[in-house]
């Protein structure tokens, strides 16, 4: 594949004066190329490999400065009448990516819609292995002037339908204002996955022409907030051109700008350009740039409701920009749908990015999240997969069968329930009557709309769809490395999961109206009971952790257990008890009226304080184990028979409880990690997770419940129409066909110039945006709901703590109400741990029998 090189040459028409050809064609990669037009492809491949390597060499060497670039452009980019940069400023509008030099052209509307086929830059065209089809030589722009649900009925269409192609995989990448590093990380990962599909020559579905069965849809949530360097990356790939989009067409405001192009260029996160010589195959890309910010759920509405009915895919892959899929992970996800026709949704493992040589593990917050992610993928997801219902398929990397998501003829189904969240949040920010009709319970519930989608999919009427976890597929993503962003992220997760969990339990009777058989329904009911217990534990988690702290640390107050002597065990307990209460008080104060970004140091101090308390709890636990063994050694007559000694140990309540406690938590963590052949996190991340555990439980839960009134979902009520891109009006009608006059690039030189500028921009370091988020005014109803919920939550946990801790208690080795409650909690936790462990084992066994 050719390369694009920047050299000064009087014959050039842009900033990159000419393309120099080198003899660096990589014939070893020829088997990765599509088989379309083999003879022409081989000729193009041999000729054009040189152009791409030229671009790479020029990009890494002899890079002129910005001033030199523009001076060169001023002398090199000329038409017959005037210099490009010498044109008047009025005709070189630089605002928001409008082309600097334009001419007015007359075009016919397509089905009363503005659709423009724009030639791609000469530099890019010369670098392509395949350039004999308009999908390679022209960028198609469509100005969507309707809502997503009306897209097909308003006469809009897409290239895959025009080419009569059947789409097996429809991949969506949603983004907001992520930078070019995050974007290229995901985009290049997707490109490599599609190349992997094309390398499967023995597959009946894939092979060299497999790229024709895959469509990648990129949805940007708001034209004004999208990162400009991401647009430069897309322009370099040929997927985007500035200056052709318009704000209004025939007096109708444009809702979304849709660009379609089949690219043969990929750019990695180091801004290196990759082509067919690096194994890149053609990829059909659809870039949907929404005019206004309407949040991720609206982006999915465009994907599912606007493009889905036209594309008619078999499997939809959902990705967040910033998540890098493994090189064959998309194929691994697709394979479970192909193997089992009852699979309606699937997800892979979400891994935390740990940096070069896992250096990010030096950050305790990242290490704790790494441990949390790993154990969730080892214990929780496999367990739920065995039952057939995964409570949440993470939107960062998951897949759905499109037929399973579709609504019925009456418009009822999973997608209907899923998109209620968008309308619901719009109502909450509207009139007071809308607030009365809706409620914040539903609003918080739809903060985790992906959980609602999973439940409605499994419970779909008269259907029997299942959800599955695919351990061989993974996606890597950045996790918050700073405490404020971590708290903000978990606030939405915790509130959404809690209220969505309540929703699932309330509506679990829908399972009986689905098409599942008796055995599967019974399994789902068992999982429902497990979810009820987990939800109750979540509600009382703050109180239960304090009770555990209270009894473990107070046990060292007893004179026969005190390791310090002279009553120091009791003094330290009193200090820790008051310190614990003070930290809780500080968290409540900070959570009720402050953003984590504004109270960063207070939250950090509380996290450190709880970590210190946890260190003391670990010391107390270790000492109690030592004393328990010592007391048992003095109390019983031990033998040389292991079985007899085990029976003696289990007959002692204190020693038995300690053994069960260790085995049902740390033992299960270690054994299950080894069985899944992933023990590394136990060595690197277990201790940070253990130390931050009280912070997880107290800080995150308190902040989440104290902010249930915050259900803001971005820019609502903004009905203004921008005019910066221009307005297209109907000038006349000819034989019933509307004709418009529109400003477009003056000639090919202008297109080439803009492409050169985008390539140069890839080497520029982006400026960091450190702007602070604005505050939103909340209605009294929001805060009233929050107040009542928090009061109920505090009352439940406080009553539990008061009832248990006011009993007579000396140490964990003496019977009391406290030790009885601790024993009950211990056995319940042990049962839940064993239940998760058995589910994980069953998942591994099922994987052995279903592999292949």
UniProtKB/Swiss-Prot annotation:
Residues 27-46, 53-97 are annotated as: Disordered. It is a multi-pass membrane protein. The gene is CHS1. This is Chitin synthase 1. InterPro entries: Chitin_synth, Chitin_synth_fun, Chitin_synth_N, Nucleotide-diphossugar_trans. Belongs to the chitin synthase family. Class II subfamily. The chain crosses the membrane at residues 492-509, 532-552, 572-592, 601-621, 686-706, 787-807, 830-850. It comes from the Eukaryota. One of its GO terms (molecular function) is chitin synthase activity. Keywords: Cell membrane, Cell wall biogenesis/degradation, Glycosyltransferase, Membrane, Transferase, Transmembrane, Transmembrane helix. GO terms for cellular component: cell septum; plasma membrane. GO terms for biological process: cell wall organization; chitin biosynthetic process. The lineage of its organism: Eukaryota, Fungi, Fungi incertae sedis, Mucoromycota, Mucoromycotina. Its main location: membrane. Residues 53-74 have a biased composition (Polar residues). Polymerizes chitin, a structural polymer of the cell wall and septum, by transferring the sugar moiety of UDP-GlcNAc to the non-reducing end of the growing chitin polymer. CDD domains: Chitin_synth_C (cd04190).
